[in-house]
From Swiss-Prot:
One Gene Ontology biological process: hormone-mediated signaling pathway
ZnF start-end (NR C4-type): 13-33, 49-73
Modified residues (N6-acetyllysine): K34, K38, K72
Name recorded for this polypeptide: Steroidogenic factor 1
DNA-binding positions: 10-85
A GO term from the CC aspect: cytosol
Organism: Rattus norvegicus
UniProt cross-references to InterPro entries, sorted A to Z: NHR-like_dom_sf, NR5-like, Nucl_hrmn_rcpt_lig-bd, Nuclear_hrmn_rcpt, Znf_hrmn_rcpt, Znf_NHR/GATA
Organism lineage string: Eukaryota, Metazoa, Chordata, Craniata, Vertebrata
Length: 462
């Protein structure tokens, strides 16, 4: 059965930005990407990228790199299982109910638009930056001061942030009773994600500060999907995450009393942020039902994307164009990054800021953020899972919840759902660039000892 869509909504293909022709393999796409995806799957083609696997895919350049185009097809939600293996015309009719539901929502929206007497405006085509947000949201004061984080354990000093903007905090190599012990084994190849405290650690890890507390159930007004409400309850408060991380960074040095380089300190911040993300994942519905092996596989696949999204959303909330906010509450001017950081890190930060501006223009809210975070965790491109069906079901429910939420709460922005999924593509590209940067630093022997991020990189490669 052919599922049509309303052409006067002027939807754009989430892969290349061309005009969509209908529902193909799980979502609305153009005819070109439909044919490309079908040929790739049916012919079992394997592509390679001659660049860094982050090529720009738009209407004019979609044929230049089939590897990146196919990866983008998967990322935005095209379904491998929807392609017929017998090479006959037509896809496997598994998604009829979802298509009908999506079409009904769009028709309802079109009726709303006609009743209100205006035409829905879509976002800019692929490759065209969104219009800048209103200037008042990004006005900078004459001088920047670090905000006072709540509930900090001996809060970070307000003085200069070293030679690169990192707070001047004593650092120690995490001992056996650090936060890592409660989640992972000492060597990552043997680590697991557990709530118990495995040998050789006989006692629970001692973490500074009180345990995380989580928000009261959020009603969110009418029409907030149940999945999003549950995810909001799982999300820890930012000031408590900050307090924990600052507390860990301020532990007295045990084996290295020397003052660490600012880059080393940033790596420690990222380590501690990742530990908080692991804690979130362990409590996530569906994830906690998976076998440990599947949990590890999912985290190995998406750890860098979750870290990037965490940083991006912090900047969206922070709302300043010419500086960034670290997880510790410290502010760093981009001009400082330009002068003190290397060109690779500076370009990475600037690329991240471009995505921040895009999400700010899209009015990304907390409900959408937690849903995007969940979608990244349960990526469908992960191979060798023991329970792939559970992961697939979680992905489909999260997609449906995000679609419902955006259509209901942002009726003036009918393609917000697709725009958010496109932003996930950029999050992935950023994460790949960040991993390349970390590995470059690792090869130069510039990474701190016992760095969890490097262990994650090496585990992915083995």
């Amino acid at each position: 059965m052919d599922y049509s869509y309303d052409e006067d909504l002027d939807e754009l293909c989430p892969v290349c930005g061309d005009k969509v022709s209908g529902y193909h393999y799980g979502l609305l796409t153009c005819e070109s990407c439909k044919g490309f995806f079908k040929r790739t799957v049916q012919n079992n083609k394997h592509y390679t990228c001659t660049e860094s696997q982050s090529c720009k895919i738009d209407k004019t350049q979609r044929k230049r790199c089939p590897f990146c185009r196919f990866q983008k097809c998967l990322t935005v939600g095209m379904r491998l299982e929807a392609v017929r293996a017998d090479r006959m015309r037509g896809g496997r009719n598994k998604f009829g109910p979802m298509y009908k539901r999506d079409r009904a929502l769009k028709q309802q929206k079109k009726a709303q638009i006609r009743a209100n007497g205006f035409k829905l405006e879509t976002g800019p085509p692929m490759g065209v930056p969104p219009p800048p947000p209103p200037p008042p949201d990004y006005m900078l004061p004459p001088s920047l001061h670090a905000p006072e984080p709540k509930a900090l354990v001996s809060g970070p000093p307000s003085g200069p942030l070293g030679d690169f903007g990192a707070p001047s905090l004593p650092m120690a190599v995490p001992g056996p009773h650090g936060p890592l012990a409660g989640y992972l084994y000492p060597a990552f190849s043997n680590r697991t994600i557990k709530s118990e405290y495995p040998e050789p650690y006989a006692s629970p890890p001692q973490q500074p500060g009180p345990p995380y507390s989580y928000p009261e159930p959020f009603s969110g007004g009418p029409n907030v999907p149940e999945l999003i409400l549950q995810l909001l309850q799982l999300e820890p408060e930012e000031d408590q995450v900050r307090a924990r991380i600052v507390g860990c960074l301020q532990e007295p040095a045990k084996s290295r009393p020397d003052q660490p380089a600012p880059f080393s300190l940033l790596c420690r911040m990222a380590d501690q942020t990742f530990i908080s993300i692991v804690d979130w994942a362990r409590r996530c519905m569906v994830f906690k039902e998976l076998e440990v092996a599947d949990q590890m596989t999912l985290l190995q696949n998406c750890w860098s994307e979750l870290l990037v999204l965490d940083h991006i959303y912090r900047q969206v909330q922070y709302g300043k164009e010419d500086s960034i906010l670290l997880v510790t509450g410290q502010e760093v001017e981009l001009s400082t990054v330009a002068v003190q950081a290397g060109s690779l890190l500076h370009s990475l930060v600037l690329r991240a800021q471009e995505l921040v501006l895009q999400l700010h223009a899209l009015q990304l809210d907390r409900q959408e953020f937690v849903c995007l975070k969940f979608l990244i965790l349960f990526s469908l491109d992960v191979k060798f899972l023991n329970n792939h069906s559970l992961v697939k079901d979680a992905q489909e429910k999260a997609n449906a919840a995000l679609l419902d939420y955006t259509l209901c709460h942002y009726p003036h922005c009918g393609d917000k759902f697709q725009q958010l999924l496109l932003c996930l593509v950029e999050v992935r590209a950023l994460s790949m660039q960040a991993k390349e940067y970390l590995y470059h630093k690792h090869l130069g022997n510039e990474m701190p000892r016992n760095n969890l991020l490097i262990e994650m990189l090496q585990a992915k490669q083995t």
